[in-house]
């Protein structure tokens, strides 16, 4: 099971909220990728580079959340 379809839905929601006049083509130009690549991102296609997801996250101002993907919280039991 993959989380990318949900990620794609989140990207689509954020695009429509922050750039309500942008269709997929207009937003893909903002990100610097082709419409076809962006369409794959919204579908959760595994072939899309993580770099493109980060570019979209940066444009949508959620890159800080993106960079925390693998951040481990410190435990009281850690040295």
Q: What is each of the regions a protein language model found here?
A:
Residues 51-68:
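DNA major-groove recognition helix of helix-turn-helix/homeodomain DNA-binding modules
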Residues 19-39:
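Short alpha-helical DNA-recognition segment
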Residues 22-24, 50-53:
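Helix-turn-helix DNA-binding elements, focusing on the entry/boundary residues of the two helices
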Residues 15, 28, 57:
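The alpha-helix within a helix-turn-helix
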Residues 1-20, 69:
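A short, Lys/Arg-rich alpha-helix, primarily the initiator
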Residues 67-79:
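Short, charged recognition helix plus adjacent turn
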